């Protein structure tokens, strides 16, 4: 079979599974809880995930025909029981917690913006069915769709983040971050920063999902690790820019405890009014 996926598609796979509404909620919560200090655990977790990426790339090089990721690697190295536990913890539980939250939030946002009379559960099911159909057409069609979606998502997040960082939005809604910024002691020092590493981890989880499609890459020896590295660095900078922008237009207490549970939507509304709300939605 002809290998069809290049480096760009590999990066899109790494990033596309992470850049999502649930991650924006986690970003807003982290920034609201400890302010811009949240960028420090964000960076530390990015480095940790890079080491994880190196491990997966090495395992893929040793066993290039293995397609099952964590479960198959554990099966070869430690036996069936660790493999079962690894599959449950790395994929099943993670997908249940993250993807259900993501598809639910997507349905809620679309209902609030465009379809107020439609049940959000119906919207979520339709979106899930749409992606199921796209996947049934094969990895080539899936990669083309994902490349376009990821490019638009990243570009949109960078732009709306830069508008916030440069304070180019609605001037009356600008928040004086410096006046309310927590000090290092107020966030609990180094221990406090470490406690937010778990929250920051959700902003990078899933970059290793490129492993199951490594067989379809044109140059897997080069592109597996390079895709994960570029994806992690790209995510760190995009999320840092967007997080700083959030703190310029939304107070920290609202970011941390947004009444609607969507701090990114509050930020977009404060930044550009209803146009920002539609844009972020």
What residue ranges belong to the model's regions?
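Membrane-interface "cap" regions at the ends of multi-pass membrane proteins
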Residues: 1-37, 43, 49-57, 65-67
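Hydrophobic transmembrane alpha-helices that form the core helical bundles
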Residues: 29, 41, 50-128, 132-136, ...
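Selective recognition of specific alpha-helical transmembrane segments in multi-pass small-molecule
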Residues: 44-52, 56, 153-165, 225-253
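Membrane-interface loop-to-helix entry segments
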Residues: 107, 120-177, 201, 205, ...
């Amino acid at each position: 079979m002809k290998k069809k996926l290049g480096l760009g598609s590999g990066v899109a796979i790494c990033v596309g599974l992470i850049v999502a509404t649930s991650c924006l909620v986690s970003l807003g919560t982290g920034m609201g809880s400890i302010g811009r200090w949240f960028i420090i655990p964000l960076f530390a977790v990015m480095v940790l995930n890079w080491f994880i990426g190196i491990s997966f790339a090495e395992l893929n090089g040793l066993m290039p025909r293995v397609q099952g990721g964590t479960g198959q690697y554990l099966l070869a190295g430690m036996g069936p029981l660790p493999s079962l536990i690894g599959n449950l913890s790395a994929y099943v539980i993670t997908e249940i917690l993250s993807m259900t939250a993501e598809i639910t939030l997507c349905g809620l946002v679309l209902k609030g913006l465009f379809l107020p009379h439609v049940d959000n559960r119906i919207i979520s099911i339709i979106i899930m069915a749409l992606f199921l159909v796209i996947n049934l057409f094969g990895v080539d069609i899936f990669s083309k769709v994902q490349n376009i979606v990821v490019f638009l998502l990243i570009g949109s997040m960078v732009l709306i983040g830069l508008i916030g960082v440069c304070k180019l939005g609605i001037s009356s809604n600008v928040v004086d971050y410096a006046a309310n910024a927590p000090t290092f002691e107020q966030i609990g020092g180094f221990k406090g920063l470490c406690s937010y590493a778990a929250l920051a981890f959700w902003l990078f989880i899933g970059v290793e999902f490129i492993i199951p499609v490594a067989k379809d890459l044109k140059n897997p020896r080069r592109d597996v690790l390079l895709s994960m590295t570029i994806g992690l660095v790209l995510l760190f900078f995009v999320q840092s820019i967007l997080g700083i922008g959030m703190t310029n237009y939304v107070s920290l207490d609202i970011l941390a405890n947004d009444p609607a549970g969507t701090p990114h939507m509050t930020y977009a509304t404060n930044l550009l009014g209803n146009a920002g709300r539609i844009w972020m939605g």
